[in-house]
Regions:
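Surface-exposed beta-strand edges and their flanking turn/coil or helix-capping segments
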Residues: 4-8, 42-44, 69
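Hot-dog-fold acyl-thioester-processing enzymes
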Residues: 1-25
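Broad hydrophobic/π-residue packing in well-ordered secondary structure
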Residues: 9-13, 31, 44-46, 52-55
Length: 70
């Protein structure tokens, strides 16, 4: 292991932040920076009429990844 959070782990973590009973039909991810083992991820959720955005951020509020679920 290279001690990085991999893409599948990011998606799994973002999925845990979805509202209950949310059905995913489509997913799109924008990877912004690498997260390493031991980094703290701060999730933010924004719901729209078309879906839900989850941003997993560092301690300064900068995103590691932004995931759009529809």
């Amino acid at each position: 292991t290279n001690h990085h959070v991999n893409n599948a782990q990011f998606i799994s973590l973002a999925g845990e932040c979805l509202p209950k009973n949310f059905t995913v039909h489509r997913m799109r991810a924008e990877y912004k920076q690498q997260a390493h083992l031991g980094d703290v991820l701060h999730p933010l959720r924004a719901e729209t009429e078309n879906g839900c955005f989850i941003s997993l951020n560092d301690e300064k509020g900068q995103p590691y990844v932004v995931v759009e679920f529809q």
